UniProtKB/Swiss-Prot annotation:
Record has Manganese as a keyword: no
Source taxonomy: Bacteria, Pseudomonadati, Pseudomonadota, Betaproteobacteria, Burkholderiales
Cofactor entry: pyridoxal 5'-phosphate
Cited CDD domains: SHMT
UniProt GO MF annotations: glycine hydroxymethyltransferase activity; pyridoxal phosphate binding
Subunit comment: Homodimer.
Protein name listed in UniProt: Serine hydroxymethyltransferase
GO cellular component: cytosol
Residue list for modification N6-(pyridoxal phosphate)lysine: 229
Length: 414
């Protein structure tokens, strides 16, 4: 019998200490990793609930195990809420992550060796869209499209390649692309060449839900996403689809790819979808975009180049070559100043993937803690101050003190 008073601090002091240290890091550092955010206490409460105890292979009303009547309620809430949020005909909320969601689409519609198209990883795509080391690149025949001379998606190249190769699947979406994507144009192309059109909106989902970024659902056969990042939910995946594809996708997720769903995570997804439907979430996402633009403009004014010239979303790539600095070096020195970001390749990057010539910055997390344009500009100046003089410990210490002053004014969790 378990004692509810037997806290984690008592049960496992070592782990508790690590968690508390991570909590302090999150409070004290400015988080600029574009794929990270802070979830609400309600999301965390659902994820830490007794639903973690229940096996529930199958779908609501059609389970392999008994005792799922309340589990069905939780999953159906998640399904109904995410469909309403994005205007989708059908949804699967069971994928454990975005990569699993993408793999399920491949399993549902492709056979090994089939041809598909996705955005080049080197120019802003995602590893699950055809990287040679990923399952998508090993088992299938990926054809990559990229960027034009303005560092925006080269739709003419995409159209030419699609007409030449006749892919069975066309993927839109990116992990490091700051501009809006023309989903309508790509959807028309997919119909023309007889391809399934899939959009991976993992990075943009929160913005889409709030109406500040184009919604791919009306134009795509399938839309996959994570539920964290800009959507601000737990770490997990979802698949939205036309009703005609529901059976194929559901069968691909279970039993094709996964066994038992993570019901505690699905419950947390349901909470996040409810939060995303509230009026305040739209205001939050508008601020996410405003903060990203303010950050980008500040960095440009301080002499840094932003890939594609700026941002229409929450994310941007900073080209560091003018500073004679690698992304790896910038990530490290900014971390010393308590500014967290990630190294990232830029288009036609001459450096290795674990070194890179750029960093990726995103505004969702700093916006969650209450930053507005003024604070975003401050952050931009902090970054520029560090990168202007990265080898001076006194300079790093000065910026770190300024970061501490700012983060104390805007706690993540009161």
């Amino acid at each position: 019998m378990f004692d509810r008073q037997n806290t984690l601090a008592k049960t496992d002091p070592q782990l508790w200490e690590a968690i508390q240290n991570e909590n302090k890091r999150q409070e004290d550092h400015i988080e600029l990793i574009a794929s990270e955010n802070y979830t609400s206490p309600a999301v965390m409460a659902a994820q830490g609930s007794q639903l973690t105890n229940k096996y529930a292979e199958g779908y609501p009303g059609k389970r392999y195990y008994g005792g799922c009547e309340f589990i069905d309620v939780a999953e159906q809430l998640a399904i109904d809420r995410v469909k309403a949020l994005f205007g989708a005909e059908a949804a699967n909320v069971q994928p454990h992550c975005g990569a699993s969601a993408n793999q399920a689409v491949f399993l549902a519609f492709l056979k090994p060796g089939d041809t598909f198209m996705g955005m080049s990883l080197a120019e802003g795509g995602h590893l699950t869209h055809g990287m040679a080391l990923n399952m998508s690149g090993k088992w299938f025949n990926p054809i990559a499209y990229g960027l034009d001379k303005n560092e925006e998606i080269d739709y003419e190249q995409m159209e030419r390649l699609a007409r030449e190769h006749k892919p069975k699947l066309i993927i839109a979406g990116a992990s490091a692309y700051s501009k809006k994507i023309d989903f309508e144009r790509i959807g028309k192309l997919a119909k023309e060449v007889g391809a399934i059109f899939m959009v991976d909106m993992a990075h943009y989902a929160g913005l889409v839900a709030a109406g500040v970024y184009p919604n791919p659902v009306p134009h795509a056969d399938i839309v996959t996403s994570t539920t964290h990042k800009s959507l601000r939910g737990p770490r997990g995946g979802i698949i939205l689809m036309k009703a005609e594809h529901e059976k194929a996708i559901n069968f691909a997720v279970f039993p094709g790819l996964q066994g038992g769903p993570l019901m505690h995570v699905i419950a947390a997804k349901a909470v996040a979808f409810k939060e995303a439907a509230e009026p305040g979430f739209k205001d939050y996402q508008k601020q996410v975009v405003a903060n990203a633009k303010a950050l980008a403009e500040t960095l440009i004014a301080r002499g840094l180049r932003i890939v594609s010239g700026g941002t229409d979303s929450h994310v941007m790539l900073v080209d560091l070559r003018a500073k004679s600095m690698t992304g790896k070096e910038a990530e490290r020195v900014l971390g010393e100043a308590h500014i967290t970001c990630n190294k990232n390749g830029i288009p036609n990057d001459p450096e290795k993937p674990m070194v890179t010539s750029g960093i990726r910055l995103g505004s969702p997390a700093m916006t969650t803690r209450g930053f507005k344009e003024a604070e975003a500009r401050q952050v931009g100046n902090f970054i520029a101050d560090v990168l202007d003089n990265p080898n001076d410990p006194a300079n790093i210490a000065k910026v770190r003190a300024q970061v501490a002053e700012l983060t104390k004014r805007f706690p993540v969790y009161d």
